[in-house]
Amino acid sequence: VESIALFFRVKCLGIDVLAGDIAKPWTDGNFGIIEINAGPGVFMHLAPAIGSAIDVPGLIMASHFKTPEYSRIPIIAGNNISKNLSDAIFNKIREINKDISYACLLEDGVHFNNDFFNKNDSHYQNVKIILRNPETEFAVLRHSKNDIYDFGFLHEGADIVILDNAEFAEESMKNLLLENGILIVISDHQIEVTRKDEVLSSISFYNEEDKEILIMSTIEPLLKEIINL
């Protein structure tokens, strides 16, 4: 089944079969495939004309996402994420997994795998373009104070939050942090890194270039951890 799904580039498919005993391998005989569906329906299982309902959607979700950690994509959120920092993150995660699909929302718009895609006037639409794309496997999202006032965040959870001299509204991004999430707070010329209110490090910097190098050095060891959850 996995080989067939891979061939058609689908995540889930349905196979209708006739079998003497569905518990036995198809190689034992008395087994025939009637139809393969790339977009299987589930309503007939939830509300069958005869017999009891079977939670097929639940079984499908459990097969793809065995624990809650697997049910979401890694997200880095921040109020002032630059193109240079995004490029550095992209390059690093491609070192970890060369096939991962990367999406980011920066001041100039939406990028997929480091290529500019589009900038919608609506922050809501830009975030939706990224999170509704079935290819997105890692997202970096920039939320400014005006975006937050007008639209909110439009997603639940963040593995890393980067607050760079944040305004009051932008500081509410702290509420997005997952239980083991990392908070990076930049104030004046100081970078403080915390996890669960415990300060992990505090570093000084002297210019923008140094700042982004230090941020990246903080993020790098975490990327493999959150990608491989």
Residue ranges and their predicted role:
Residues 1-79:
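ATP-dependent carboxylate activation and anion-phosphoryl transfer catalytic cores
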Residues 75, 81, 90-182, 186-228:
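ATP-dependent carboxylate-amine ligase catalytic core
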